Every structure is written in structure tokens, then in C-alpha cells.
Amino acid sequence: MANRVVLDFEKPLFELEAKLEEMRVYLRNSSRDQDSSDQDVLNREIEALEVKVETLRRSIYKNLTRWQKVQLARHAERPFTLDYIYMMTRDFVEMAGDRYFSDDKAIVGGFAILEDIPSGFSQPVMIIGHQKGRDTKSNLYRNFGMAQPEGYRKALRLMKLAEKFNKPVITLIDTPGAFPGIEAEERGQAEAIARNLFEMARLTVPVICVIVGEGASGGAIGLGVGNRILMAENSWYSVISPESCSSILWRSWNYKEQAAEALQPTAEDLLAQGIIDRIIPEPMGGAHTDPEAMAGTLKEMLIEELRILMSKESDVLVRERVEKFSGMGVWDE
């Protein structure tokens, strides 16, 4: 528990769990020296504390605020794209480079086989997503999941390759935004994202987009045009982060909680607004508490969606995708 990453709202639970663990250790170490009545008393105290821990856990995670969900989406131990790829698929072949400038490590992708042996489902897919790092060194290598123009161009190259071989495309979105540096702008960041929107809308193969963590602005939508949009329970998807919104409206990051409430960036919010199609349930406490279970749930939902989408003709897929995104938003005439 010493190395566990604890968010501010999780501290009461963490402290209670630590106390429970201390009591268990004490019971194990002193069991030979205590008589049975003392052990019974301690066992009852442990059982009562276990109930208290579970009650507190449910109270916290069943009543998360929007800002707390944003924090969970950024959790350092949350599974990233490559984690999902290796847990959900086999025979992944990573492909590199945009064939124009370089290979952006903030976006990974390649062909893999998504299969479910009991049901007999086995399908080669092109799977692409943002990739963050676990520590300072790997985050610098991955640019904190913020893609350069060549990252989006690499993603588009892989999507067009999937279209050529008539294979479905799956994108996993987890980014704090596209890289905003001067060099990215010089190499056409806006054009690269816009080109992806244009081309993804016209792909003749099924496209499923999944927000697994952060979904910030153009950096997210650059991989986000699909027939079906799925979203993890504790992820967020918005035109701007709560902190940036707060700094613009209130000239301070201190109002990020209010900004999160106003932005309504959570899966429940976006499902109600018709922006996404399904919410992926997470284990209690977040995807990082049981990555294998989370990957299993996502894999099951992807297979369900692919079975439906792969039965449709190419022109139907394109038409439904365009109509889906054309119908989003609210405006006055």
C-alpha cells in the first residue's frame, strides 16, 4: 500500500484500509501468544472494520463529483492503450511512422487479432490509440500522450491501410490534448486533425472509438469519428479541460470543480446528450484497481459492436457515421 497512488478524496478510505491491514498483521503475528478469547475479540473488530471499509468505499465511488471523475481518468496507474492491446488482443504488430516526417510515440497502432474463443469470434482489427508514460522518463518519451501532427498522420495512414484490407478500426482515446508547441503548429497540427476528421468520416470499414481516460479537445476528436463511441465510466471528454476552462473564465485554476460541473464532461453527461453510445462499467474504485477485468469488459463490448457493424454494407457505415456527427450539438436558427 506504500506505493499506491492516492487521490485526495480517497485518503479517508486509504487510512481506514491501512488501519485494517495493521490489525490483520498484528493478528497474524500475535496469534500464538494470545488466547482464543482475545483472538475472537480481535477477529470481530476486524470484521466490523471490513464492513466499515466497504461501506465507505461504496459511499465514495458511487457519489463521485465530475471533478473527481476527471481525477480518476488521470490516475497514474490506470491502464493505457498498450495495456489494453496486450490484454484484449493477440499477435499485435505495431506499425511506425507517418511517411512524411517522423514516428510520434504519443500514438501507437497496428494490426491485431481480437478474438473470443468460446463464441468462435476471431477478427483482425486495426487498433490505434494515444499512449502515455508511467514515469517521468516514459512520459517524456511519449510526450505525455500529446500527439504531434505526425502522430495523427500516422493514425490516418494506418486507418487507410485497414480500409484497403477491409479490416475494422478501433481507436482508444486518452490524451490531455494535442501538443500545442510552436513546432507542431509549424508542421500543421490543425490541418492534421482536420484531415483525420474528414477522412475518418469516409472510411468504408467499421470504426469504433473508445474514450478510456482523458478526452481533451481536438487531440481527442482527431481519433474520435466513429460509428460507435464508447466511454469508460470514469473518463472525461470535452472541448477543454476543467483547469483551462477555469483559467479562462475566472483567471485562476482554483475554480476547476465549478468548471467541471459546467462542462458536463462525464460519460453519464455525454450519454444523456447523445454524444456517446455506451458506457463501459469500471471496477469499483476505477479501471486501475482491476485492469484485467476492465479489459475483459471492454473486449466483450467491442465484440458485440463489431458483430453488428460488420453485417452492414460500406455505404451504410459511411452514411450512419456522417448522420451521427451531423446530428450532434444544439443551435438556434
UniProtKB/Swiss-Prot annotation:
The UniProt keyword set, sorted, is: ATP-binding, Cytoplasm, Fatty acid biosynthesis, Fatty acid metabolism, Lipid biosynthesis, Lipid metabolism, Nucleotide-binding, Transferase
Gene Ontology molecular function, alphabetical: acetyl-CoA carboxylase activity; ATP binding; carboxyl- or carbamoyltransferase activity
Specify the domain of life of the species encoding this protein. Bacteria
Database matches in InterPro entries = Acetyl_CoA_COase_a_su (IPR001095), ClpP/crotonase-like_dom_sf (IPR029045), COA_CT_C (IPR011763)
Instruction: Report if keyword Lipid metabolism is assigned.
Output: yes
Q: What is its EC number?
A: 2.1.3.15
Q: In which pathway does it act?
A: Lipid metabolism; malonyl-CoA biosynthesis; malonyl-CoA from acetyl-CoA: step 1/1
From the Swiss-Prot or TrEMBL record, state where the protein is found. Answer: Cytoplasm
Q: Which GO terms describe its biological process?
A: fatty acid biosynthetic process; malonyl-CoA biosynthetic process
Q: Describe the location of the CoA carboxyltransferase C-terminal domain by residue ranges.
A: 48-308
State whether keyword Lipid biosynthesis applies. yes
Q: Which GO terms describe its cellular component?
A: acetyl-CoA carboxylase complex
Tell me where the transmembrane regions lie.
Answer: none
- Could you tell me which HAMAP family the record lists for this protein? AcetylCoA_CT_alpha
Role, per record: Component of the acetyl coenzyme A carboxylase (ACC) complex. First, biotin carboxylase catalyzes the carboxylation of biotin on its carrier protein (BCCP) and then the CO(2) group is transferred by the carboxyltransferase to acetyl-CoA to form malonyl-CoA.
Q: Assembly and interactions?
A: Acetyl-CoA carboxylase is a heterohexamer composed of biotin carboxyl carrier protein (AccB), biotin carboxylase (AccC) and two subunits each of ACCase subunit alpha (AccA) and ACCase subunit beta (AccD).
Assigned protein family? Belongs to the AccA family.
Tell me the protein's name: Acetyl-coenzyme A carboxylase carboxyl transferase subunit alpha
Q: Which organism is it from?
A: Chlorobium phaeobacteroides (strain DSM 266 / SMG 266 / 2430)
